[in-house]
């Protein structure tokens, strides 16, 4: 019995392979049969680069067979027939080569490497159409020597913000609350000799922004932080400085002045014991009595319990 099932399965696979995968590829068109990435460097895996390709071949089950494409090709040309509709719904239409998307993929890959510090990266693409109605696209990448950070410094004009940005991780016990700031928040992501990676630079801005917002700078955002990169040494190294943009305050007369960023403090704290977000009745939210203790106002309504 198992032998018969195996034979049926082999016949089924042979039937799939024998089916034309270019049935719905028109004249002058090419099925995108395969995409290859060839790189001189070993820094990034092909799997890391594929998301930047604007066009991918049809899906391969277990990396062996484009069964969804074969199912689609089983359908007839009469789109109104129920069986053809079902086959096309279960299958996948052939991916037709689009040279515009190939060009865009080259640009995306080059932008990726530039953002990672490979400022002189070379990316090109070649298209092989020697097989009938099928195309193989090969992307060739030459990363060349990357730029690295030589010296990194912070030049934040506000002394309070500068001190917060340079905070060291506090010593906490193992039982410290999980909701408190983790030590990673205090560790700079930018290191000397590291790649001039723009994604890391952006994460560093966000790290400092998080530190500031947790300390009362609620109106602060990462756009107030910028960098100046000096590569004049011309040795694939960069001197990097972080700068702080001032807060621009508009006066009543319409003039704009640069000022320090504002740090907010908690003034009043009120606790409403009877508050129910599911109840819209205003009377239930109206306080019947107020108790002040340790600088906190406790308001409770007619259903609340006195805590005097």
Residue spans for each PLM region:
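Interaction-mediating elements
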Residues: 20-308
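C-terminal motif of bacterial Sec signal peptides marking the signal peptidase cleavage site
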Residues: 15-18
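Bacterial N-terminal signal peptides that target proteins for export
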Residues: 1-7
């Amino acid at each position: 019995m198992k032998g018969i099932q195996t034979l049926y399965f082999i016949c089924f696979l042979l039937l799939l392979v024998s089916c034309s995968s270019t049935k719905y590829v028109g004249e002058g068109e090419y099925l995108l049969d395969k995409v290859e990435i060839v790189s001189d460097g070993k820094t990034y895996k092909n799997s890391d680069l594929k998301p930047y390709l604007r066009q991918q071949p049809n899906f391969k089950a277990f990396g062996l067979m484009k069964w969804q494409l074969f199912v689609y090709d089983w359908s007839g040309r009469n789109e109104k027939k129920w069986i053809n509709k079902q086959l096309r719904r279960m299958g996948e239409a052939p991916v037709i080569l689009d040279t515009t998307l190939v060009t865009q993929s080259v640009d995306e890959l080059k932008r990726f490497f530039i953002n990672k510090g490979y400022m002189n990266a070379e990316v090109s693409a070649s298209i092989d159409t020697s097989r009938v109605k099928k195309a193989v696209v090969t992307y060739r990448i030459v990363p060349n020597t990357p730029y690295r950070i030589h010296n990194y410094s912070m030049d934040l004009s506000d002394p309070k913000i500068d001190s917060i940005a340079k905070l060291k991780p506090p010593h906490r016990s193992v039982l410290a609350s999980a909701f408190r700031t983790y030590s990673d928040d205090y560790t700079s992501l930018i290191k000397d000799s590291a790649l001039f990676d723009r994604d890391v630079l952006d994460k560093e801005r966000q790290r400092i922004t998080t530190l500031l917002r947790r300390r009362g700078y609620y109106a602060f955002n990462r756009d107030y932080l910028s960098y100046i990169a000096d590569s004049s040494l011309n040795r694939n190294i960069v001197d990097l400085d972080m700068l702080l943009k001032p807060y621009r305050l508009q006066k009543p007369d319409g003039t704009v002045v640069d000022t320090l960023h504002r740090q907010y403090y908690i003034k009043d704290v009120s606790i409403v014991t009877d508050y129910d977000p599911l109840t819209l009745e205003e009377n239930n939210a109206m306080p019947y009595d107020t108790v002040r203790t340790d600088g906190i106002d406790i308001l409770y309504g007619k259903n609340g319990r006195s805590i005097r």
